[in-house]
Amino acid sequence: MTEQVLPDENKLIAERRAKLEHIRANCPANGHPNNFDRKHKAADIQAEFGNNTKEELEGMGIQRSIAGRIMAKRGPFLVIQDVSGRIQAYAGKDVQKDLKATFQGLDIGDIIGVTGQLHLSGKGDLYVNMEEYQLLTKALRPLPEKFHGLTDQETRYRQRYVDLIVNEDSRNAFIMRSKVVSAIRNFMVKKEFMEVETPMMHSIPGGASARPFETHHNALDIAMYLRIAPELYLKRLVVGGFERVFEINRNFRNEGLSPRHNPEFTMMEFYMAYADFNDLMDLTEEMLSSIATELCGSPQLPYGEHTVDFGGPYARLSMLDAIKKYNPDNATIQSMTYEEVKDVEFMRDLAKSLGMTIEKFWTCGQLLEEIFGETAETQLMQPTFITGYPADISPLARRNDDNHFITDRFEFFIGGREVANGFSELNDAEDQDNRFKAQVDAKDAGDDEAMFYDADYITALEHGLPPTAGQGIGIDRLVMLFTNTHTIRDVILFPAMRPQA
């Protein structure tokens, strides 16, 4: 897809370029001054003086300096937008004449600075009289007259700068994203977690089951991988004595694009010594409930046709029980036991009976997870912890004491999608060694997402990892819930896009 420029738009661009040439010839700083002191924001002015009468403002003689982008022209009034909101500027007849002579007039999209007295219009709108003014940046390309006219979603994502200029909902979504990240960070610090940074390039990819991006380090002449997860490095820090650590950063997975997936995405991953997966679930409830109330004023948030209640307590049920709950009419599923789940032929037949396409290398645990994803996952609208993940799909998680087929692991679902993954960490070095070897066998059998063997991590475990619990929370998916958006591209400023034709 190539950017389409209509003939009328070409004409407008040419006219604006001609204006810029005039400005360069007649104005200082080559038409791009950098000496305007913006002292006030639109929203602050509106909040402070929005309730004053016209007469009160006249008597106060308030001077304000504003700067921003012209979003509309209404006779002598210009609507100026800055990061906080909008306010008007008024150009009297003499000012209009000067604007015409100096700049050949102002256009929508131009960035200007204005200083003058604050007034109230006859319609009750605050405005700054243009007593002093500068054209700070001449916009050469016109904005869409109405954002409704920019209906191509790809254009919104490829030209996010235009999207942010003209779409208030988009701006608010990314403001909320920033607030969510800050609130999570503050929560973790208050809980005495230390924020750390671990490598983004790994010599051995690990910490998750995913296909990595590969690159080459020229000086060392070795293959390097963009990290798929920081887990193994963070647990090395717990071995080293940092008992509570967290990291908010990017992960990279060489996989497909979808409303829930982007090749690079943001995770908050944390580890706490002397805790188990039950402690993680409790902490997650406390975190999300407090953040929702802090940022939105209520733990109950709208999401599509639903209302998601972050207030807690959150439902907790095993993967097997969830499959049974959401397949009430399937007699085979209703009578299914863990002994049958361990029978790979039984699980394959069950998956096929559900119309699923299966891979030859799928284990019993993978089949159970796929059946869960096919029949139950999308039903989990309210916050729900799904426990009882099989050990063969949880190579870094501690086995359950009562049922060694499963682990002390959960995934956290809201709005029908996974938002977090956590577990009691496997700190048995010999068991971890065996599970890494099983992952190597799976990779040899065709599973591209199976983990690599990491000998140094085994060495770290042999020094002793205390009982530890760790969790990763998908920031992008969480922000989707807080902003009531349904594609991950709406909460990532510059999402991955297919090349334009």
From Swiss-Prot:
Q: Which GO terms describe its cellular component?
A: cytosol
Top EC class for this record: ligase
Q: Transmembrane stretches, by residue range?
A: none
Name the Pfam families on file: tRNA-synt_2, tRNA_anti-codon
- Extract one GO BP annotation from the record: lysyl-tRNA aminoacylation
Main location class: cytoplasm
UniProt remark on cofactor binding: Binds 3 Mg(2+) ions per subunit.
Q: Where in the cell is it found?
A: Cytoplasm
Keyword field contains Aminoacyl-tRNA synthetase:
yes
Q: Name one GO molecular function term.
A: tRNA binding
Q: Where does Mg(2+) 2 bind?
A: E418
EC number(s) reported in the record = 6.1.1.6
Which family does the UniProt entry place this protein in?
Belongs to the class-II aminoacyl-tRNA synthetase family.
Matches recorded under PANTHER family: LYSINE--TRNA LIGASE, CHLOROPLASTIC_MITOCHONDRIAL, LYSYL-TRNA SYNTHETASE
User: Assembly and partners?
Assistant: Homodimer.
Q: What is this protein called?
A: Lysine--tRNA ligase
